[in-house]
Design a protein with these regions (language model features):
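Hydrophobic-ligand binding "helix-grip"
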Residues: 37, 51, 61-109, 113-118, ...
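A conserved amphipathic terminal alpha-helix motif
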Residues: 113-147
């Protein structure tokens, strides 16, 4: 199964962490969208519109900023989900995956792709700021899941 876009991104970034935390616990934290702020300091307010499934909308407000509307575009229960934000002609696509590494280890992967009109300029300008907190956010996620 191809988790990535068919369109070639103009900017991409991926970060992964390995953990002994239970995959089910990580998935429960991901699927509990209303409580993402417990492990993601980059969220001031968040609202899930509909069930956590393909087509769901998520209104996420970073501290001191306007809300960002995300749409869940792919979801494999217990394995992965992808959300997209659109700004003009730009598409910011983030895929979150759980990769089993054996019975008691998991690789947690976040991947962002920025594509669309103007992405070759905008991607390098905005992408690093958006993904800068991923190492801390992912560390907090797996730490909470391990409890």
């Amino acid at each position: 199964m191809n988790f990535w876009s068919e369109e070639a991104p103009m900017w991409e970034y991926e970060h992964a962490v390995e953990t002994a935390a239970d995959r089910g616990a990580i998935w429960r934290l991901w699927s509990d969208v209303e409580n993402w702020g417990a492990w993601n300091g980059g969220i001031e307010k968040i609202e899930l519109r509909g069930p956590f499934a393909e087509g769901a909308e998520i209104a996420m407000t970073p501290p001191g900023e306007d809300p960002v509307l995300l749409r869940v575009t792919a979801l494999g229960e217990g394995e992965h989900f992808t959300d997209e934000a659109r700004f003009g002609g730009l598409v910011l696509r983030t895929t979150h995956r759980l990769v089993p590494l054996g019975e008691d280890r998991t690789r947690v992967v976040y991947r962002m792709e920025i594509s669309g009109e103007g992405a070759e300029e905008a991607g390098p300008q905005i992408g690093p700021g958006i993904t800068a907190d991923w190492p801390e956010t992912m560390a907090a996620l797996v730490e909470l899941a391990a409890r």
